[in-house]
């Protein structure tokens, strides 16, 4: 009879968000020693002596150690459901004194978290009441039922979700923008005459979740906070921005001026949640103009953002006497923003005293560190999502992402969203990519090591916050054990280590010791639950070994008891079994039930068998349960100690994880370059952009039956503006995007899809490719087009890359031509920005005769009788026709309409 069939009755859910209960400390007022007299002599000292006398050997890796104990489930609340909606629709409508004690406690907690959905654990369900129940039933399509609220109240609205499915439902609430407060059970057996102890164990918000199932594995989950000083007659608007990915510990701060810059930065960050206390002394904070519409704005009190409070919050969190070492006193608004953010994180993570969400020291983001990409450019270039439907497939990230780990995927996404401006840093990345492209065996060996890596960044964070499960710790050990192998492979090949890989050069010895400690303590495949035991190796702890020896003795007694009862009853088919509800029992067939001994007590009757218990068996059952409870509690204590040890090492684990992520991203880029026939661009600080046989990295992959037509480009060395003409649908927009993507790929350190390339660093990439009405803002297509053009003209410099696809087409022909001409002159003359301007205004070809730094190029077509063949080749010279009518015919416009269009064109030309 396996001892693991028994189950602890003293359990708690504390520290386990959605898992099975975890062992609890004994309740106050109750003895921590077993109640069974036979256990009085089983002191810690005697158990340790037993372990020494009967030493246990740890299982070798790969051996089975699968406990079969089942958690004891608390019965669900049994109130009958009602199909009628109760009268009480809001908790504020009731007098708490008239409520039942449980609902009174619920209302008290709800008053502390009015803006959040409060889920209250009752047995196997998380329930909510009043307005939360109504909202939950509507959003999650749950049945709205009711619960008795008291004699004077009657039934109140109630809706609930099963405990085992809570993570899935909470993830859906978070996705819809709700915040959730979880009130969990802190014990399973209340003190006599008292309510079951419950309390808020977690607050889940879109920007602070740590649970794997609520996070996108391959993108950061940013929480942001901003402090704004309004503009005055003498000073512009100034702002400080702090952003943190609570799941990875990454923290960044910056301070700038101008509302446009803030809007652009927030759009690029795409945070899950933005914290802001509003302007002035007004009550509620209205959505400011600099806040992107889709960003989730969470209002906060002003106090956490005050300078004194923010400074104290930072000092407490980082255990510092002064903030001078962080460099934040020079950025007062950023400091205040980070202080408010940190206070919000602390408020939403009710942790144990020895646990905290590990956040890195904030990194200061200086102006000019990254190539600037506004929202329009990121959308037009389809960096991480397609313009049509917002899907990953068809984007640049989809085309080049060959990373093998979640960490590497997030790293590559960050690179695409903020390409480098530092030439040395870019060249360091490119050198590694080049090494891995040419060294195929090295690349394959590294990728074999990377493939099974877990998400060390987020696993370390969960350990530090006290939320990591045993399998999380085993995954951390798996990853840390691979560090020496990665370092060995790289040291034999890399002459110069990029700064981003230095954490892998000489892994900290403490990390190897930590991995060994995890392996020494935990079995290789621990169960998901922390409450059922079966986590810790034999031979780790004398007290635990002594308890296990005692449980082995109980197993032996059960087996012997089964044999004896068979002999006494003369029934060889008798079985001694265990049921998690009824405990241990003797099972006999119906035919033999009448001949059982008189001292047997009938426990349950089934269709084909009868189940009995005996006083001796029941007494032994109590002994087993108490031993099991002590063993599970001891395992949990050992596990928590190990988890705390891992959490204390979160910073070095994450440093190594970021090195792994960088290596994964670089090896993925190398794989893309090697299989795609890409080249290593020659990078410099000039304005030159020379591309030979360049290709669009996404379109080339999507083409199946035809090959991509490559094209050249030479900008910045004599020519600053290219006027690009050609037919509709001939590939002008594709050519423009291809140029921008090659520039961007070069500045993240990647190879590029071309035969060769010389790339001077750009400070910004601007694109104006197509326009749509912004009816919500009251802007027509033409106004949107002009606003985008104005943004380019105000912010472009000689180092910018400007890609324009038609300007002025939304108004009268001569007005549009005039605007396009003036914009072209300004870009080529005053700004000298490197520009490619695709247009159907063929009159702009005349600019090349007036300005030496303007050149004409066209996309070629071939006319074969009535047919038009798009060659997709870009060559010198300006086109004289747009072939719009032919393009309309190819698009399926009815023949009579096409014929009439030709007649009108001839009349206009005459």
Swiss-Prot record:
ATP binds at residues 726-733. The keyword Chloroplast does not apply. Residues 44-54 have a biased composition (Low complexity). Keywords: ATP-binding, DNA damage, DNA repair, DNA-binding, Nucleotide-binding. It comes from the Bacteria. Residues 1-94 are annotated as: Disordered. The keyword Cytoplasm does not apply. GO terms for biological process: mismatch repair. GO terms for cellular component: cytosol. Gene3D superfamilies: 1.10.1420.10, DNA repair protein MutS, domain I (3.40.1170.10), MutS, connector domain (3.30.420.110), P-loop containing nucleotide triphosphate hydrolases (3.40.50.300). Pfam families: MutS_I, MutS_II, MutS_III, MutS_IV, MutS_V. Residues 1-15 have a biased composition (Polar residues). This protein is involved in the repair of mismatches in DNA. It is possible that it carries out the mismatch recognition step. This protein has a weak ATPase activity. Belongs to the DNA mismatch repair MutS family. PANTHER family: DNA MISMATCH REPAIR PROTEIN MSH1, MITOCHONDRIAL, DNA MISMATCH REPAIR PROTEIN MUTS FAMILY MEMBER. This is DNA mismatch repair protein MutS.
